[in-house]
From Swiss-Prot:
Protein family according to the UniProt entry: Belongs to the autoinducer-regulated transcriptional regulatory protein family.
This protein's record includes keyword Cytoplasm: no
Protein name: Transcriptional activator protein ExpR
Superkingdom classification of source: Bacteria
Keywords: Activator, DNA-binding, Quorum sensing, Transcription, Transcription regulation, Virulence
DNA-binding region, residue intervals: 197-216
Pfam families from the UniProt entry: Autoind_bind, GerE
CDD domains for the chain: LuxR_C_like
BP GO annotations: quorum sensing; regulation of DNA-templated transcription
DNA-binding as UniProt keyword: yes
GO molecular function: DNA binding
UniProt organism field: Dickeya dadantii (strain 3937)
Functional note: Functions as an OHLL responsive transcriptional regulator that acts in virulence (soft rot disease) through the activation of genes for plant tissue macerating enzymes.
């Protein structure tokens, strides 16, 4: 199934929260996770904790077309470091973006690369700030395998969320298994209607602990932080099927 990535705010924020959480143990580095369709490079998604102004300028000017880091990543499989010399060594004459990046102290970095089955380039770049260069370089060098796996897991989560959104938007009538079990869907439905766990338990004739158990499974399936995020994602992506009226059981 071909997936078309777009800038869906909630999905992007979900992935950014995931990356922020995972990167805390690596010193909270500045990062940019970029996904670009190699057949249609104008289709790009950027999830980053770089300065917002820099990300907006990059996206609005389609700088992925002239970014030496991205142009190098297209032809790479293994991770690589970069700085001003990349423009010279790669014989790319696109120094304009590096001149802009200097204004935001984005001069040196390290990029991890992934090419997915949908012909997309996924690149996770870390900015190595000058005042922390030795510390961050050592962290990256000692954890390259873990950071590469982080890119893979983040991209898998992103792909899964967009795939599910695409299925629901197209009202697919295939017989593939539902994302949620019947009970999980019922609980999500009532939670999205503003019911408390105790009220849901009464409506469905189950215990509050059972409600919490199923909500925990939903949170895991969606790869989000908590029940509130799961309910919001379920509503925004139309993942929750309507259920019939239920009477409280005594």
């Amino acid at each position: 199934m071909s997936i078309s990535f777009s800038n869906v705010d909630f999905i992007n924020s979900t992935i950014q929260s995931y990356l922020n959480r995972k990167l805390k143990s690596y010193g909270d580095p500045k990062y940019a996770y970029l996904i670009m369709n190699k057949k249609k490079p104008t289709d790009v998604v950027i999830i980053s904790n770089y300065p917002t102004e820099w990300v907006d300028i990059y996206r609005n000017n389609n700088y992925q077309h002239i970014d030496p880091v991205i142009l190098t990543a297209i032809n790479k499989i293994s991770p690589f470091s970069w700085d001003d010399d990349l423009v010279i060594s790669s014989k790319l004459k696109f120094s304009r973006i590096f001149n802009l990046s200097k204004d935001y102290d984005i001069v040196n970095g390290y990029t991890f690369v992934l090419h997915d089955p949908g012909n997309n380039l996924a690149a996770l770049s870390f900015m190595i700030e000058e005042h922390r260069s030795e510390e961050l370089e050592e962290i990256i060098q000692n954890n390259k395998d873990k950071l590469q796996m982080l890119l893979i897991s983040a991209h898998e989560k992103l792909t899964s969320l967009y795939r599910e959104m695409s299925r629901n938007r197209n009202n697919s009538k295939s017989q593939e298994a539902d994302l949620f079990s019947q009970r999980e869907n019922e609980i999500l439905h009532w939670a999205s209607m503003g019911k408390t766990y105790q009220e849901i338990a009464l409506i469905l004739g189950i215990t509050t602990s059972t409600v919490k158990f199923h909500i925990g499974n939903v949170v895991k399936k969606l790869g989000v932080l908590n029940a509130k995020h799961a309910i919001r994602l379920g509503v925004e992506m139309n993942l929750i099927k309507p259920v019939g009226p239920a009477k409280a059981r005594s």
